[in-house]
């Protein structure tokens, strides 16, 4: 069941809260771990070839299990580890001393100790460590606190298994007696030469790594057989989302859409609605007089698919089906679904919750260029597919069967299409990201980019037999920072920003340093094990824009962060961005290359942010400070050079410069200067017809020659801005887009003043309805978990709960600002007469004042003239 733009689409009545009392006595079905009677997935055949989708841990058999996809048979299989691989962690204490730690050696899960050699990432020398081997992963968690130092003790077991065996999810493997052998694609000579040419000047460590990465980027991505699932549940009250764990209300419809062309709707026959339905081409509708029969049929269908897709299935569809099945007296062994640690599991394959994938900030911004700003199925599908959900004018429980089928099926179709549009772009993207991060598909799609990058670097450490250092050890070596932070909460000085003047500037060209921070990391060999290292013969100082020496970088050996970051950057820029534009290859191949470069863009752009985050395990303050310092030095030096060339820089931020009316030859000179002095690519990123600057940083309104606009930092673009402001801003945006020359400014200023006056008066006269005035904010966690302070949308949510509405995390709460103790009311409980006009006037001001300043218009002057006009108008 996908979420609408808001949970509360219909008004509620106070007496409906009575139902809340009734539901409290409902017993929650008990979950059980006894799932042994049915083997949902067959064993892989020896000698056959499969795609590795992910690795799990089977607690009953105490071994790793690989989930494998057979491209030809379109089925999923498992391969259980036969090598005897066990969980473990490391310590620098000798075995004889470890043997004296009773909490370790007397733990029932303790297995044995081993002496092993690892490579110190700082010195490159071998170090001796004790390997503590245990019988189950939970033992690592128990034991690690009993040792002064426990290395590699916070890694999930199945990821450890992947590292130790050098596995890469998403690649092709041959099964051989409980082991997997990687099979690489055969490339033509010219393809290999093209890649080698791109890395001709690289160090040996990078060249070796390039060879390992070719299969990651060149291996085909299978069109995995998959089916999307969406359920609809009867609820007696409007505005209520059923509790999945209670699962007290019947599932009235289940829609499935498969990439094999199947479209199936399973609906429950009910006496309270019209059960007639019209036949639709290609749609298989099955009506059931029993909900249990409906679910049995559902389980039969989904077992035929290796991959199950949902949108918000972790939080709703999967747990609701699972607990509802238990309530209907299915035994757990009959249900191919489970709920583990808040995740919906598909025991007959793998389950991808697309909501969590599209919710990922790095995916939204870097892979899809911010095309969607809200995360509901409707918002994402409208932005990426141009398709929306079926609009309803009544409550789902009141729909006749025919309309219910249409509504439910549309959701399932949209969910599937999110993985099939543009030649399976999203599926391919997920597989490529899995290959790069070395994460299985289920974990990849449920975690943030910081987890992806951490896993990639851990895998690369293990491949080189490097010890993964403790976070505390990294901080001891590189915790010293030399610059003071400008932004509160930061530990060091960040990027340089050249303050913009307030005003309108025509013919503005934006120059962008391509992948500035990743390029700095690569070109300056920056990595946690190369900064401020005593054991070094070749040191290069990092200087900031003032000339102060902050840190030194060791150039004796390539740093792992520099190697991996540079490799991904160069693969993208020098190889795959070009390949994605080749005309002499198939559309399918070109599509794959485009996905490859998109996937790498995600990693490139997220790298610095992750390594500069304090909660990242490889975080080194000196590394982050060095990167930003070099960035400031480059921007400042380039700015000074631009001035020497008589180029007028009107704004600069982090990795870009805005130039006013530059000449082509001077631009080329500046680009050449940057290449020669820093070995960086300075590119023309965009050209504006004009830019209106408010005078604030990261805050401007740009218009392109074709009339399209770009808004940066202005409140009207924010997701939770009231609808009336968005609508009025859109009209003003169209008005401003028509501005073609400085001569047009007086006329546009006059229109702008008149428009603002009209909006102001309409607001004062209560001409906007509650929907127009509503703020929309998503609830990120349960209402009761807000203990320190209570945000406005939470206050509104608490009011709704008092009226019997079940408010859950990820629900979008609509509220208005009113004159009351809380200052807000949910839209369902508010009246237009209660609206606090002054608060909305302030919101109006903070939104439009930014635009007004750019045109030299004073908000206070506009309001004062309105007041004077009103005064004299009342005298007539």
Swiss-Prot record:
<dbReference type="Pfam" id="PF00136">
    <property type="entry name" value="DNA_pol_B"/>
</dbReference>
<dbReference type="InterPro" id="IPR050240">
    <property type="entry name" value="DNA_pol_type-B"/>
</dbReference>
<dbReference type="GO" id="GO:0003887">
    <property type="term" value="F:DNA-directed DNA polymerase activity"/>
</dbReference>
<dbReference type="InterPro" id="IPR036397">
    <property type="entry name" value="RNaseH_sf"/>
</dbReference>
<keyword id="KW-0808">Transferase</keyword>
<comment type="function">
    <text>This polymerase possesses two enzymatic activities: DNA synthesis (polymerase) and an exonucleolytic activity that degrades single-stranded DNA in the 3'- to 5'-direction.</text>
</comment>
<dbReference type="InterPro" id="IPR012337">
    <property type="entry name" value="RNaseH-like_sf"/>
</dbReference>
<keyword id="KW-0269">Exonuclease</keyword>
<dbReference type="InterPro" id="IPR017964">
    <property type="entry name" value="DNA-dir_DNA_pol_B_CS"/>
</dbReference>
<keyword id="KW-0239">DNA-directed DNA polymerase</keyword>
<dbReference type="GO" id="GO:0003677">
    <property type="term" value="F:DNA binding"/>
</dbReference>
<dbReference type="GO" id="GO:0000166">
    <property type="term" value="F:nucleotide binding"/>
</dbReference>
<dbReference type="InterPro" id="IPR043502">
    <property type="entry name" value="DNA/RNA_pol_sf"/>
</dbReference>
<keyword id="KW-0238">DNA-binding</keyword>
<keyword id="KW-0548">Nucleotidyltransferase</keyword>
<dbReference type="InterPro" id="IPR023211">
    <property type="entry name" value="DNA_pol_palm_dom_sf"/>
</dbReference>
<keyword id="KW-0235">DNA replication</keyword>
<protein>
    <recommendedName>
        <fullName>DNA polymerase 1</fullName>
        <ecNumber>2.7.7.7</ecNumber>
    </recommendedName>
</protein>
<dbReference type="GO" id="GO:0006261">
    <property type="term" value="P:DNA-templated DNA replication"/>
</dbReference>
<dbReference type="Pfam" id="PF03104">
    <property type="entry name" value="DNA_pol_B_exo1"/>
</dbReference>
<dbReference type="InterPro" id="IPR006134">
    <property type="entry name" value="DNA-dir_DNA_pol_B_multi_dom"/>
</dbReference>
<comment type="similarity">
    <text>Belongs to the DNA polymerase type-B family.</text>
</comment>
<dbReference type="InterPro" id="IPR006133">
    <property type="entry name" value="DNA-dir_DNA_pol_B_exonuc"/>
</dbReference>
<dbReference type="InterPro" id="IPR006172">
    <property type="entry name" value="DNA-dir_DNA_pol_B"/>
</dbReference>
<keyword id="KW-0540">Nuclease</keyword>
<keyword id="KW-0378">Hydrolase</keyword>
<dbReference type="GO" id="GO:0004527">
    <property type="term" value="F:exonuclease activity"/>
</dbReference>
